[in-house]
UniProtKB/Swiss-Prot annotation:
Its EC number is 6.3.5.-. It catalyses: L-glutamyl-tRNA(Gln) + L-glutamine + ATP + H2O = L-glutaminyl-tRNA(Gln) + L-glutamate + ADP + phosphate + H(+); L-aspartyl-tRNA(Asn) + L-glutamine + ATP + H2O = L-asparaginyl-tRNA(Asn) + L-glutamate + ADP + phosphate + 2 H(+). It comes from Myxococcus xanthus (strain DK1622). GO terms for biological process: glutaminyl-tRNAGln biosynthesis via transamidation; translation. This is Aspartyl/glutamyl-tRNA(Asn/Gln) amidotransferase subunit B.
């Protein structure tokens, strides 16, 4: 049976570091990039005799995320110890949640070629992150950095509702957008603050019995997620077709070789010997707290995208880019209050503004001009006060200096000539000097029209209103 005769079954476990200033059970900083083992204390180092204290902000972020993903929030959730030995886990156990997580039974809607699809979310639970092992230290050594130990995490576990690698990528992108909009995570896959594991299995099409699943790790980009899942699907089908059985295991995506490699046998829950965390009381979340969190939720990416297409009449492509990041969407809406041709505004955003931000490496928050000034510039272009090309130059100067568009236009002499009489005088002069070209044009060589436009614009040093130049030339040439 070829791969096409099998149905992939995929679920994702998303691990999102929370944007708190301190760790989940102590006051150590969560800042990324500090000197190894600098952001540590007896609590996150697992020293004897210390007691954890829950960072309230972590619970607030968990409730906010659960509500955004349409989960049921448990009034009471319980902490557990997950026991395993690894060099970067100093206590020998991880404080997490097991059978009573804070959030359950949610969903996230994604777009597929067949339309919208709701991916069910099994659970969301809070836990502490482990440290980080560094295996390329040289000299055959592995080093341990415990700065990350105790950093607060949300683990968001989907049901196995994804059916191919593209759906998995779409789900992960949608999840990242939601978490970033909520302000609970920065969405950075490269630094590992937003990462995922994929559980992949295959079954013959038409079957209702899932195959044996393998967990894939080291998926630190959307591209690697897609490549790893596609490889693993083909690998499992090949194993089955060869008469073998897929072994439940954890496999590592090898970026250099483009394959998954066996890492270890896949553990079951009983392997971790979960038991209640004796040093932390159950977490109680009141109905009033849940209601307040629900009321404070921002407009989420999918709802904002739909509103941008309906309220502003934007194509789905434009709306998707503009709403991908909340600051960009907010800035567009601020500009829309000063300039009402929303499609043209979108074109300037997706073209010149995005180009300038990328080339200069400037965050949107550092823009030196106001939404009102951008609206003023686009209005000047519409009214013929400055050409579209000159308008781009003005925007670049606004970007670099923060000066008002009117001042830049005046200083650089970019004002466009829209005086009909002045343009007509230049047109008459050009036509009088090019009688031969006029004959060619009237004989059917219409491409000569571009020659006349160029001559007029050159004579006016590029400041002639193009629409008026074209109109007057056509009138004079008898069109």
């Amino acid at each position: 049976m070829p791969v096409s005769d099998f149905q992939p079954v995929i679920g994702l476990e998303v691990h999102a570091q929370l944007l708190t200033q301190s760790k989940i059970f102590c006051g150590c900083s969560t800042a990324f990039g500090a000197e190894p083992n600098r952001n540590t204390c007896p609590v996150c180092l697992g020293m004897p005799g210390v007691l954890p204290v829950l960072n309230q902000r972590v619970a607030e972020f968990a409730v906010r995320t659960g509500l955004a993903l349409e989960c049921t929030i448990r009034p009471t959730s319980v902490w557990s110890r997950k026991n395993y030995f690894y060099p970067d886990l100093p206590k020998g156990y991880q404080i997490t949640q097991f059978d009573q997580p804070i959030c359950e039974h949610g969903r996230l809607v994604i777009d597929t070629p067949q339309g919208e699809k709701a991916i069910r979310i099994l659970r969301i639970h809070m836990e502490e992150d482990a440290g980080k092992s560094v295996h390329d230290a040289g000299g055959g050594q592995s080093l341990v950095d415990l700065n990350r130990a105790g950093v607060p995490l949300l683990e968001i576990v989907s049901q196995p509702d994804l059916r191919d690698a593209d759906e998995a990528v779409e789900y992960l992108k949608a999840m990242r957008d939601v978490l970033v909009y909520l302000g609970v995570n920065d969405g950075n896959l490269e630094e590992g603050s937003f990462r995922c594991d994929a559980n992949v299995s295959v079954m013959p099409k038409g079957s209702t019995t899932f195959g044996q699943r393998c967990e894939l790790k080291n998926l630190n980009s959307f591209r690697f997620l897609k490549q790893a899942i596609e490889y693993e699907i083909a690998r499992q089908v090949d194993v089955i077709e060869s008469g073998g059985k897929v072994v439940q295991e954890t496999r590592l995506w090898d970026v250099n070789k483009g394959v998954t490699r066996s890492m270890r046998s896949k553990e079951e829950a009983h392997d971790y010997r979960y038991f209640p965390e004796p040093d932390l009381p159950p977490l109680h979340v009141s109905a009033e707290a849940i209601a307040a969190a629900a009321k404070a939720l921002p407009e989420l990416p999918r709802a904002k995208l739909q509103r941008f297409t309906s309220q502003y009449g934007l194509p789905a492509y434009d709306a998707r880019i503009l709403t991908a990041e909340r600051p960009l969407a907010d800035y567009f809406e601020a500009c829309a209050g000063h300039y009402k041709d929303y499609k043209k505004l979108s074109n300037w955003f997706l073209g010149e503004l995005m180009r300038l931000l990328k080339e200069e490496g400037t965050p949107l928050s550092a823009l030196r001009f106001t939404p009102a000034q951008l609206g003023e510039l686009l209005g000047a272009v519409d009214q013929g006060m400055v050409s579209a090309n000159a308008g781009k130059d003005v925007l670049g100067e606004m970007f670099r200096t923060g000066k008002a568009p009117a001042d830049i236009i005046a200083e650089k002499g970019l004002a466009q000539v829209s005086d009909t009489g002045a343009i007509e005088a230049v047109v008459d002069d050009i036509l009088a000097k090019n009688a031969g070209e006029i004959e060619k044009y009237r004989a059917g060589k219409k491409q000569v029209f571009g020659f006349f436009v160029g001559q007029v614009m050159r004579a006016m040093k590029g400041k002639g209103n193009p629409a008026l130049v074209n109109e007057l030339l056509k009138k004079k040439l008898g069109d």
